[in-house]
């Protein structure tokens, strides 16, 4: 547990902090709890869609990320299958990254598509070897082949850049490119953090934490480094979010991130797409992405921002 006395922080800045349930901000406990609670809201009208029964029910998606403990209350029972590509970690230990992205995608309180099911491939990003990510994606491709029509894996959320310019990976980068082409050839959409036209379409943005459902008040980039998201990309909320946390089996918790990276945006966009596929499962990946782009809103700062409600309305129209 970390305890901060009143004179060690400025209460006005709490919304910008990163902290977990084990952090105590003396004198601001109520505000801290409020910020943690508000951060669970995906914003942009997602909860209104949930009230209408649009929750990703019946849709299979996939994640490739670090090792995950499967029983956090946000997503217990939602992992359809789990495959470890070679993390070599204690089975009772988790990572910071994996529960966060999983909860953003399918979390009960946090998630964009809480009723979707996840095929999860655990990959050791710290080894800097893209072969593990490729291995995970090939596993997803093979699992997908076993599924009947109507239950196919639609989209893979990869909060990493296993190849491309600026990639932190140092080995077997081409293996990722080849695996992505194989997945796309099988009709599976892959979203990752590379700067490419087909997979790198998501950009970081952030909502107004006081008015998280107001898309026009969203801004591109990060609270400390804003930029305008161009029309070639889709801005998705990555900051002021609360995510699931579990480092040891049986000790689930939450972490609030005043500033999240693009990693938090990929599963969010994946979740929105899952909502779309629930509404019209007949659409293919290219049609779905096209509608996602067409229905974006322009925020006050000129950024191209995801608009989940407009997206769902447009998907509904394709059924008529």
Predicted regions, residues:
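Autoinhibitory propeptides
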Residues: 1-39
């Amino acid at each position: 547990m970390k305890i901060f006395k009143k004179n060690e922080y400025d209460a006005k800045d709490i919304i910008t902090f990163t902290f977990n349930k084990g952090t105590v901000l003396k004198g601001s406990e109520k505000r801290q709890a409020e910020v943690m609670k508000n951060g669970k809201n995906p914003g942009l009208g997602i909860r209104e869609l949930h009230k209408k029964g649009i929750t990703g029910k019946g849709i299979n998606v996939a994640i490739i990320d670090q090792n995950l403990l499967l029983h956090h209350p946000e997503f217990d029972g939602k992992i359809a299958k789990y495959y470890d590509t070679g993390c070599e970690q204690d089975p009772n230990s988790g990572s910071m990254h994996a529960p966060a992205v999983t909860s953003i995608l399918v979390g009960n309180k946090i998630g964009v598509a809480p009723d979707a099911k996840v095929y999860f491939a655990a990959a050791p990003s710290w080894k800097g070897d893209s072969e593990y990510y490729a291995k995970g994606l090939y596993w997803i491709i093979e699992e997908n082949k076993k599924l009947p029509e109507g239950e196919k894996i639609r989209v893979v959320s990869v909060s990493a850049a296993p190849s491309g310019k600026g990639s932190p990976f140092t080995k077997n980068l081409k293996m990722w490119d080849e695996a992505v082409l194989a997945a796309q050839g099988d009709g599976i959409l892959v979203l990752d953090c590379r700067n490419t036209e087909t997979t790198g379409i998501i950009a970081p943005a952030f909502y107004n934490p006081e008015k998280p459902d107001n898309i026009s008040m969203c801004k591109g980039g990060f609270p400390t480094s804003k930029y305008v998201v161009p029309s070639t990309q889709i801005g998705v909320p990555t900051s002021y979010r609360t995510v699931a946390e579990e480092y040891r089996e049986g000790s689930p918790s939450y972490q609030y991130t005043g500033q999240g990276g693009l990693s938090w945006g990929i599963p969010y966009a994946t979740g929105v797409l899952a909502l779309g596929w629930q509404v019209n499962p007949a659409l293919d990946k290219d049609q779905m992405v096209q509608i996602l782009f067409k229905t974006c809103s322009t925020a006050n700062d000129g950024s191209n921002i995801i608009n989940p409600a407009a997206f769902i309305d447009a998907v509904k129209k394709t059924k008529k």
